[in-house]
Design a protein with these regions (language model features):
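Structural signature of hydrophobic alpha-helical transmembrane segments
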Residues: 37-46
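Transmembrane alpha-helices and immediately adjacent membrane-cytoplasm interface residues
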Residues: 46-118
């Protein structure tokens, strides 16, 4: 057993898991106690009522059919299935959270020239205008921006040096929100700068996901950071209680400096993301740096999750800096995506669908996981059947072998429609990027899987006719050169892999 695993087992996380297991066992035991000490007809009636109520709740949920089928299969298990659904199946807001949600909807700052930009875009392209309108309708805090320069980084290590330089130049505030932080060269060099910036009077806020950092940071790490003057908190903190909220992780990657410069993409703050250490071959990731007006949206996204997690209303006007417009072509929409009922629509999925459906020449996609529902599968297939050059790149060396089996399980159906599938031969592709027709692109944290599209808090940047698109296209061209194209002749499942795939696909909405 490694030191990390031992530390995790002996930490509060190990205790929480143990206590949650006890809660589940106690609930299960209560029904056997009911059956033993009360009339048989009463226990049958209670269990029957629970079973019927669970089935009705699942059927009437506003969720994808695949999700319903999975939970219906689980609900068939007597007592245990209903308990699992009650604890993990449906997220409901408390009264306090409903008040917070209303407050969030009122806390927004719009871009002054957004209306004019949309008007001009509508005259130029009604199709693209419709896509923009869709994003702004689903994420009420998103907006359309110009006056922004962008730099695309095809590797985490290329972003790293510029990030350090930007952090050293911070004057007012630094916001950091990441899924994974791990002590090592990358994080320690960032932390050293943050500590110095605090001494200079710069405000530093840090938000990291508690489960994402469960195996990388000590349970009391926030205390250490606060002693340095960094306002650090865990997102959706793990406590010894069974709750569906643990499904909703903060998978975002956001870093904002003075409201003027912002970073996002697939890169977490750990050494494998800059290839300082090797875990699964060469780590292929990407990031985007924004300088200018569009950074307002990243600032707002951070403050929204800060508020969701902390319940503290920040004075948005403090951070609504009139950042200078930077000369740069094209339009940008940094947007957020997340679980219901915080987000009423699946923003990340819908943006991907709209880009795929509007494409006429090509759509290129990289994703570490390919576990998608029927609707998105059909959109990708139909694009290929229309004659669009659709290419999807996934890892050749996986971080999770069982998940790779499910990912590969999607290949044949897509290839049958003419979709080209590639595996990144040098190692693990972790970047989440989509490029369509040299016209628009998305770079962010959103994987092509249920966890990203349904359960997690995510973010990305949609770009239209920006200079970065050429850099993204060059990156895709290089990826295709070093990757292996999958064909029916080169791709075969063994019998036991096929069995695993069939079983795992039943539970795909939970993966």
């Amino acid at each position: 057993m490694t030191f990390r695993k031992l530390r995790l087992l002996m930490s509060k996380y190990g205790f929480s898991i143990l206590f949650m297991g006890f809660e589940l066992w106690a609930s299960f035991a209560a029904f056997f106690w009911l059956n033993r000490w009360f009339p048989h007809w009463l226990s049958v009636a209670v269990i029957g009522l629970l079973y019927v109520s669970t089935i009705l709740a699942i059927v009437n949920r506003n969720t994808p059919p695949e999700n319903k089928v999975t939970w219906l299969l689980i609900a068939v298990i007597p007592v245990f299935g209903s308990l699992l659904y009650l604890m993990f199946g449906e997220r409901r807001l408390s009264k306090k959270e409903m008040i917070q949600l209303k407050n969030m909807e009122s806390m927004k700052f719009r871009e002054d020239n957004s209306h004019q930009l949309r008007k001009e875009l509508k005259q130029e392209s009604k199709a693209v205008y419709g896509l923009v309108k869709s994003i702004l309708s689903m994420d009420h805090n998103a907006d359309l921006y110009n006056g922004t320069a962008s730099t695309f980084y095809p590797l985490g290590e290329e972003m790293y040096e510029q990030l350090l330089e930007d952090l050293r130049a911070a004057k007012k505030f630094i916001f950091i929100e990441f899924y994974i932080i791990d002590e090592g060269l990358m994080w320690n060099s960032i932390l050293e700068i943050l500590e110095q910036k605090v001494k200079e009077g710069v405000e530093v806020k840090l938000l990291y996901d508690d489960i994402g950092c469960m195996a990388t940071l000590a349970g009391n790490y926030t205390k250490r950071l606060r002693k340095m003057g960094i306002d650090a908190h865990k997102f959706n903190k793990v406590i010894p209680r069974l709750t569906v909220a643990y499904n909703n992780r903060d998978h975002r990657k956001i870093l904002v400096i003075d409201g003027q410069i912002g970073y996002t993409g697939g890169v977490n703050l750990a050494d494998e993301y800059i290839n300082h250490i090797e875990r699964f071959g060469h780590w292929k990731d990407s990031a985007i740096r924004l300088d200018g007006r569009a950074v307002k949206a990243l600032t707002r996204l951070f403050l929204m999750n800060w508020y969701i997690n902390r319940g503290e209303i920040e004075d948005f006007d403090r951070y609504h800096i009139e950042n200078k417009a930077v000369e740069g072509e094209g339009l940008y929409i940094p947007y957020g995506s997340g679980p219901k009922p915080i987000y009423k629509s699946q923003v990340g999925k819908t943006v991907y669908q709209n880009m795929i459906n509007q494409s006429t020449d090509y759509v290129y996609i990289t994703t570490p996981y390919l576990i998608i529902d029927y609707d998105l599968t059909e959109d990708i297939r139909n694009a290929a059947l229309r004659g669009v050059d659709v290419r999807i790149v996934t890892p050749h060396i996986p971080d999770k072998k069982l998940i790779q089996i499910v990912t590969r399980g999607a290949y044949l159906d897509l290839m049958d429609a003419g979709v080209k599938i590639y595996e990144y031969t040098p190692g693990f592709v972790h970047s989440k990027q989509v490029l369509a027709d040299d016209e628009m692109a998305v770079v962010g944290s959103i994987n092509f899987d249920y966890r990203s599209l349904v359960h997690h808090y995510e973010n990305a940047v949609w770009m239209y006719r920006t200079p970065a698109l050429k850099e993204i296209r060059a990156d895709f061209d290089h990826i295709f050169e070093v990757s292996q194209e999958i064909t029916e002749d080169t791709f075969r499942f063994t019998w036991h892999q096929s069995l695993i795939k069939e079983i795992m696909q039943l539970f795909a909405p939970m993966l």
